[in-house]
Design a protein with these regions (language model features):
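Active-site metal-binding core of divalent-cation-utilizing nuclease and nuclease-like domains
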Residues: 11, 35-77
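Short secondary-structure junctions
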Residues: 26-32
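Interdomain/boundary linker segments immediately adjacent to catalytic/signaling cores
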Residues: 1-15
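Basic, amphipathic alpha-helical patches used to engage nucleic acids or provide basic targeting signals
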Residues: 64-127
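Conserved alpha-helical elements of sugar-nucleotide-dependent glycosyltransferases
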Residues: 15-19, 95
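Membrane-proximal, solvent-exposed terminal domains/tails of membrane-associated proteins
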Residues: 133-136
């Protein structure tokens, strides 16, 4: 087959686009990346020893909705998830718990917001800066 069977797809849902714009307005001094694979921001520590591949495989296919990066373009300040109706499923909650545990063990705070209860821009700024202050 000379032509591969691929097509473009949207990178974010409508709710994620709205939230992304709110993040940009609330936190203009930071860089915001969307749909970031965990394997791009965390890796198994030396403590994993020969089990590095096992731990890597636990998170390599997972992603976070948004990552806030310092202006040095290297420091991850906080991971942000926008939960929607799919968050109610037990499987999704198990996956999210695994994601939260991995990020926490790497020292990256994770914040969760619900798509139907997004905070306003001012409150979003206050909440995110408080988490950065606590963990920074």
């Amino acid at each position: 087959m000379n032509v591969w069977p691929f097509e473009t797809m949207l990178i974010m849902t409508d709710s994620e686009v709205l939230f992304f714009k709110k993040l940009q307005l609330a936190l203009p001094e930071f860089l915001i990346f969307s749909q970031v694979q965990l394997s791009r921001i965390i890796e198994p520590s030396d403590e994993a020893g020969q089990d590095r591949r096992f731990w890597f495989n636990r998170v390599c296919r997972q992603s976070v909705d948004f990552v806030l990066i310092d202006t040095d373009c290297q420091t991850v300040l906080v991971a942000i998830e926008l939960d929607d109706w799919t968050y109610d499923s037990q499987d999704r909650q198990r996956q999210d718990a695994k994601k939260d545990k991995a990020l926490s063990s790497a020292g990256i705070p994770i914040m969760r917001f619900h798509a139907e209860k997004m905070p306003g821009i001012d409150m979003l700024r206050v909440d995110v800066l408080e988490v950065i202050r606590q963990f920074g």
